[in-house]
Curated annotation (Swiss-Prot):
Protein name according to UniProt: Photosystem II reaction center protein T
GO cellular component: chloroplast thylakoid membrane; photosystem II reaction center
GO BP terms in the entry: photosynthesis
Pfam families xref list: PsbT
Keyword rRNA-binding: no
Subunit composition and interactions: PSII is composed of 1 copy each of membrane proteins PsbA, PsbB, PsbC, PsbD, PsbE, PsbF, PsbH, PsbI, PsbJ, PsbK, PsbL, PsbM, PsbT, PsbY, PsbZ, Psb30/Ycf12, at least 3 peripheral proteins of the oxygen-evolving complex and a large number of cofactors. It forms dimeric complexes.
TM annotation in the entry: 3-23
Membrane topology type: Single-pass membrane protein
Family: Belongs to the PsbT family.
Keywords of this entry: Chloroplast, Membrane, Photosynthesis, Photosystem II, Plastid, Thylakoid, Transmembrane, Transmembrane helix
Presence of keyword Thylakoid: yes
Compartments where found: Plastid, Chloroplast thylakoid membrane
Length: 35
């Protein structure tokens, strides 16, 4: 069960860092087909 907790914490940390960078620097990719 400990492995599950560590995996959850790891994914949570990576997710927070990813969203922090994403909202700080919006991607300059041309979005097509998005409503």
């Amino acid at each position: 069960m400990e492995a599950l907790v560590y995996t959850f914490l790891l994914i949570g940390t990576l997710g927070i860092i990813f969203f922090a960078i994403f909202f700080r620097e919006p991607p300059r990719l041309p979005v097509k087909g998005k409503k």
